[in-house]
């Protein structure tokens, strides 16, 4: 976990990994959209996004686990499913705390892992945003841009702000789409797997679909503001979905308890088992041999 957090920090806050310089056409209409401004000027700012992504599944897990623990029937099943981990002579980790730590810990790990995958994809591909040419401000009077079908590999042709150009080279996959769908799907899998409601059958579907719809609208907002291409958002959705499904199904096993495997019965010690006496069965060869021996003794006599 510490290594994952450290790697995410290097991707986000340092220049350790340089973005690939991808070429472009000076007259590419897909890269000439208006500049939407910084990320802080977006309708969904990074601060709001990260707070909602981290707080929503964590709050759902806390509320769900505490509610189930205080229901008698559910508490008994949880205690039967979970093992109690001894942490000392006088302290132990009860099933409620253990489930909360496990589910929130796996969620946090997946959040950092998704961020790493997204940053790695953006660094390796260097895919250009829809507003790249607007902030790049290439020198259209140069010989390279005079030809309409000339592919430009020289990154020095840009005359705009270098920091903005650097961010404009990070489009594939969409980080907002990947993180939002991961968080929404993880929370949805938890709700459908653990929370049981008999009073209202529409409560869980409405809550789950509302959560997924929020993630979907986050991706659409990136496209509508010309911050990402449609392909970037789709790739982000696929990446976040894959991470959430893997962790939910293969790591926490659909949020079920970790029952210990039934221990195999120990074989009985043969030294403590009394021996059983079986009747002796006389062999026909022994009988015939005894008769021949008796006859020979009679002849000698």
Model segments located where?
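Membrane-embedded catalytic cores of phosphoryl/pyrophosphoryl-handling enzymes
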Residues: 98-102, 113, 137-299
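N-terminal transmembrane-helix/juxtamembrane module of multi-pass inner/ER membrane proteins
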Residues: 1-106, 116, 120-133, 152-159, ...
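Alpha-helical transmembrane segments of multi-pass membrane transport proteins
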Residues: 109-110
